[in-house]
A protein has these predicted regions:
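Short C-terminal tail/terminal secondary-structure segment
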Residues: 92-95, 146, 206, 223, ...
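The beta1-alpha1 cofactor-binding region of Rossmann-like NAD(H)/NADP(H)-dependent oxidoreductases
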Residues: 38-39, 59-70, 103, 216-217
Length: 247
């Protein structure tokens, strides 16, 4: 599905990002894994290479526009082009009522989850324009569609990612670049796995499928949207949510 494509993943050291990188490689892409967690990112790249794929790891601070430019330049230097990018890196931030958030707790989440995606998208677009286009998938959230108490910076950032995605699609569709967003619900990541059993059971009950999702289930959707099989699909938000938003 992605044979001979070059794909870049941010936040690829673990969880959903790692699953996306692995599925990209399984489908034939050469993968650039990026993260600020060097051991985890290198482990993801090693997993892909040991399985017969081709991957490299590059460190990335998503809040640095210069670092994004360095990573994309190195990707093009090593592989000749950039066909696919998945902007996945993000944090949940602190859980507080909106009135209790500080400028610092707000800015940290917005800088990583929204501005970091903008820095990535901007740099990725400019690389893709040189080779005739590509596909960008931004990882949003179910909270890019609805609210949730005590996490307003995250909700605001993810709504922003959905809006940014639509604008990129409108601006660059005629130039061969597609851009979509994927909104996971609660997924079996390290954060969720470490929650008490009663909390995880409650989270499971909020989904129509009555379970928490697997990272690979999100990754399969991302890989399909990244591929030429989704050639007429752009500017859209896709929930990988087990029916959470059907409530």
């Amino acid at each position: 599905m992605l044979k001979n494509k070059v794909a870049l993943v941010t936040g690829g050291a673990e969880g959903i990002g790692r699953a996306i990188a692995v599925v990209y490689a399984r489908e034939g892409a050469r993968v650039v894994v990026t993260d600020c967690n060097d051991p985890g990112g290198m482990e993801t790249a090693a997993m892909i290479n040991q399985a017969g794929g081709q991957a490299i790891y590059l460190p990335l601070d998503v809040t640095s526009p210069e670092n994004h430019e360095q990573v994309v330049a190195e990707t093009c230097k090593q592989f000749g082009r950039l066909d696919i990018a998945c902007n996945n890196a993000g944090i949940s931030g602190e859980f507080r009522l909106t009135g209790d958030h500080t400028p610092e707790t707000w800015k940290q989440v917005i800088d990583i989850n929204l501005t970091g995606v903008f820095y990535g998208v901007r740099t990725q677009i400019n690389a893709m324009l040189k080779t005739g286009g590509g596909s960008i998938v931004n990882i949003a959230s179910i909270l890019g569609q609805v609210g949730l108490e005590e996490i307003s910076p995250y909700v605001a950032a993810k709504h922003g990612v959905v809006g940014l995605t639509k604008n990129v699609a409108l601006e660059y569709g005629t130039k061969g670049i597609r851009c979509n967003s994927v909104g996971p619900a609660f997924i079996k990541t390290k954060l969720v796995n470490n929650l008490p059993d009663d909390v995880r059971n409650h989270l499971s009950s909020m989904h129509a499928l009555k379970r928490i999702g697997e990272p690979e289930e999100v990754a399969e959707m991302v890989a399909w949207l990244s591929s030429d099989k989704a050639s007429f699909i752009t500017g859209n938000y896709y929930a990988a949510d087990g029916g959470y938003l059907a409530r």
